[in-house]
A protein has these predicted regions:
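Active-site recognition of the HExxH zinc-binding catalytic motif
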Residues: 72-89
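Short pre-active-site segment immediately N-terminal to the catalytic Zn-binding motif
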Residues: 58-74
Length: 222
């Protein structure tokens, strides 16, 4: 049921043990794992390095890159799988729109594509629901990195995770994903300015961080 394009036996022992564990957990819930020899994959019209899809279901990671990069992606996406199999409230949250209960990620993508319009209060509800899914996932991922002694810099991971979480506030201003090569969690002059912990109020974005991300990721003068 799995598609493994990489040579797992060449991985460091700790990483191999963890990858085998994640494959086993996924398969125990009838979720295939695809570790593909690709630089990127697509989901919901968005190009990315990996994803977990609950409707298919499948856990997919593009592995044609440095090991420490795709391992980080797999950590993150495996935590989305954990949210799904644990049936967490955050993962299962629906938002009412026009008397229908809708998936917040679906609503966000439709809004970004200008397929629907959302009033300011509803837009914030949608974006915060999406951010909460990712924030919970990142907190889980940071714990998993420590638990399995994965070769990932914990401090840097948390900083990049915070850049990702704050991005959802930025989307409400730009109505655009960042341009190619302008990801806030890859631009060192952005993510290195992020907090090194998750102990903060994510319902709002600090002005300095907002201005930094708009300037560096979207070339917007502030």
């Amino acid at each position: 049921m799995n598609t493994i394009d990489i040579e797992l036996k060449k991985l460091p022992k700790d990483v191999l043990g963890w990858v085998d564990y994640e494959i086993a957990v996924s398969n125990s819930y009838d979720i295939p794992v695809k570790l593909l020899s690709k630089k990127h994959v697509w989901i919901d019209r968005v190009r990315c390095h990996g994803y977990f899809c609950s409707t298919t279901p499948e856990l997919v990671v593009a592995c044609y890159m440095e090991e420490n990069e795709w391992v980080q992606t797999m950590v993150h996406e495996s935590c989305h799988r954990d949210q799904f199999i644990e049936k967490t409230t955050i993962w299962n949250k629906k938002i009412e729109l026009d008397e229908e209960k809708r998936d917040p990620l679906e609503l966000m993508h439709s809004w970004l594509e200008h397929e629907i319009e959302l009033k300011p209060r509803k837009l914030k509800e949608v974006l915060m629901a999406c951010m909460n899914i990712e924030l919970d996932c990142e907190i889980r991922a940071a714990k998993k990195i420590d638990e399995f002694y994965l070769p990932i810099n914990h401090k840097e991971y948390v900083q990049k995770a915070n850049a990702y979480a704050y991005l959802y506030h930025i989307l409400g201003t730009t109505r655009l994903w960042y341009p190619k090569g302008k990801s806030p969690f890859y631009l060192a002059d952005v993510w290195t300015k992020m907090p090194t912990d998750f102990d903060r109020d994510y319902t709002k974005i600090p002005t300095k961080i907002k201005n930094l991300m708009l300037a560096k990721c979207y070339n917007k003068r502030v």
